[in-house]
């Protein structure tokens, strides 16, 4: 895991990340990490790493992918199968032990399955008022929206899909990957080789942006996998594009 400071300096923050994927920072500046090979951990500001969970109901998790944190401090994560089902993620190939590819909550040290109704759950994000939870389904490229009723998810419905006219990725199909919500409630959805799309809170696609893939000949060149919002005023969008980080100003 790398860090990027305000002066543009890039440093190794965690040398052996255990095949980390999605990251999120809680109110105590702990960095929560979803690990492809089947666990969720957090690292304290002092650098101490703690495995929080690797099982549910006595069975191994599949391949935790992305994380969202509610204002109450609870951790929500998706658990598809990528790390244990596809070569190249660094994990040992194994069968899925969980009966569903779930969306889980960690609260007060307890892990709870909230839903297993999304075929391949990937990116995850709450609306600013936390009335809704958005979950990207990489099986069909659709972002689903759940209503949040206390601790439960209800009224799932297909919300948006990136409209680009591009052909599906040969391995992953139509991708909906990592997501972020800005201060205006707009939802940013990464879409693999389709770039990333910006949707208004009412689900209208405002823009589709396809970053420059650079000179790399890798099959992942130009592949947008995740996003983060940061900067001094939370007015910058950081986008992971293949092996590059591209930064946009949010207007």
Q: How should these model regions be labeled?
A:
Residues 1-2, 39-41, 101-104, 142-144, ...:
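A short loop-to-beta-strand structural motif that recurs across blades of beta-propeller domains
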